Amino acid sequence: MDEVLFYVSAGDQSDTKKPAESFAYISSIHSSKQYETFRHAASPLNGTAISGVGLGERIFTSDNKKALVNVYTYGKESIDQRIPIPEALTALHIIHHPTLPHGAEAKGEEFENSLATHDKPNYRVPWLLCGGSKLGKLYIWELASGDLLCVKEAHYQGITRIDLSLCGTFLVTGGEDARIMVWNLADLIAIYGQAGLINETDSSSTVNRSGKPYYSITDNTLPITDFTLNQVGNLADLKLYTASKDSTVRIYDITTKQQLTTFILPQPVTCLARDPANRQLYAGLANGLIKTIPLYKFNQHTSVLEAVGGLDRIITVDQEDPNMLSTFVQHENHKVTKLCVSMDGTNLISGDDAGQVFVSDIATKQTIKSFPSLNFPISDLYVETVPVDLLVNDKIRTDKKHRMMPPLKRVLASADPVDHVLFMDIPQESVNTIISTKVHKDLDWLEKKKMEELLFKNLSDVNSTVKTIDTGANGGHNQQSTANLELKLSKVSEAYTDLRSKHEQLIKEHAKLLDKLAEGK
């Protein structure tokens, strides 16, 4: 396994006829290995979406100046497709297909615990492509068909970032109008077979798609620069962390629609990253510093790890940090544009407006690796852990089954499900499905027994192990041993009784002697 980083820049923003060439790379963060290079790759901040790393995966970048989406395929250096769209986009995000195996829906199992029963097809595309424009419009396309499922006036100004919750329920957008909108994804794309939405008097069967946001956040005063969601499958624990140019980082509970905590920082916050274990946040500032915001704090009086903030508290992050215990200074004098954290939470990857990308050790705050500079502001970072053989597979270079994506349509899709034509490559069922399912069930059984043992021991110092006595072939020997033990016990009892009687007799004689001495006096 290797942990790789995809990084891309915003490219040359000048109006020259021949702008400087820009690149994007996929490199290891633990070694000097560079796996892939993509030429002419550039996008605005948060304007890149990557489906993954390996055979059949794609990279989508929005053009800085034109209404185009450039598509790259893994293993090919140049642009694979240029897809025209209604207007230039400033933010992109892809949504993958739900991965539910047979019977998982009926059993009510969580999707992250489900077991895939089919291999990945050679030709595959993500499920949806979401894009935000400079005018604040939200576009959602179905990539397999190219249908435009949604066009929404989501913000008054340009959209800066789009993201989806891990459970796939909520789509979150942030904009330059200082607002964050939380949408129900099902409401945005549910256009097929909706009773009461089709206008029977209209021959074109137009649909009323005026869906309202689930939650509208208007607490900020300056544009939203970044936000992140904690990766939980349970909606009750879903939290939203936002960053803004008004120098604040805010935490919201999506389910209760309440603001939990506000952190005030000394400089405008340009980007935000979250620890995989939700232990702390990392805020990139406009002056090049990266501040660590702990979400838990050790209470010295009670010796308990307590959550920081809550109940709409306002906490000021101290600007003075002479010992650099909570500050990264690798990008000093350069605005930090993107942040991300490694899988194990030990390394922080950061990029700035000078095109520099560093990997820093979170514990020591030291730089452990630097990547070749892209000379333009870093617009996106993506970290993934993949097998090494997948990165250097020769099949990537000779993928004959690769097909082009359909063009993205400019008009909304019809509400009639008959008009919905979808082409997908469905592979055969995996040969190891039965074996994998059996192994999966065995692991579930072992996990169940482990929890039962934990509950039985009750987390105490009492040893609850039940000892068993073998009553098999050695039954006769055990009976003889029992008889010998009973004989010894009877002898000990007789000796004890004799000793006790002698002791009582001596006590009586001693009492008589004391009485005689008393009478003599």
Curated annotation (Swiss-Prot):
Pfam families membership: WD40
Superkingdom, natural source: Eukaryota
GO BP of this protein: DNA-templated DNA replication; rRNA processing
InterPro entries per UniProt: WD40/YVTN_repeat-like_dom_sf, WD40_repeat_CS, WD40_repeat_dom_sf, WD40_rpt, WDR18/Ipi3/RID3
WD repeats: 106-151, 154-193, 219-262, 321-361
Entry GO terms, CC: nuclear pre-replicative complex; rixosome complex
Subcellular locations according to the entry: Nucleus
Family: Belongs to the WD repeat IPI3/WDR18 family.
Quaternary context: Component of the RIX1 complex, composed of IPI1, RIX1/IPI2 and IPI3 in a 1:2:2 stoichiometry. The complex interacts (via RIX1) with MDN1 (via its hexameric AAA ATPase ring) and the pre-60S ribosome particles.
Role of this protein: Component of the RIX1 complex required for processing of ITS2 sequences from 35S pre-rRNA.
UniProt protein name: Pre-rRNA-processing protein IPI3
Native source organism of the sequence: Lodderomyces elongisporus (strain ATCC 11503 / CBS 2605 / JCM 1781 / NBRC 1676 / NRRL YB-4239) (Yeast)
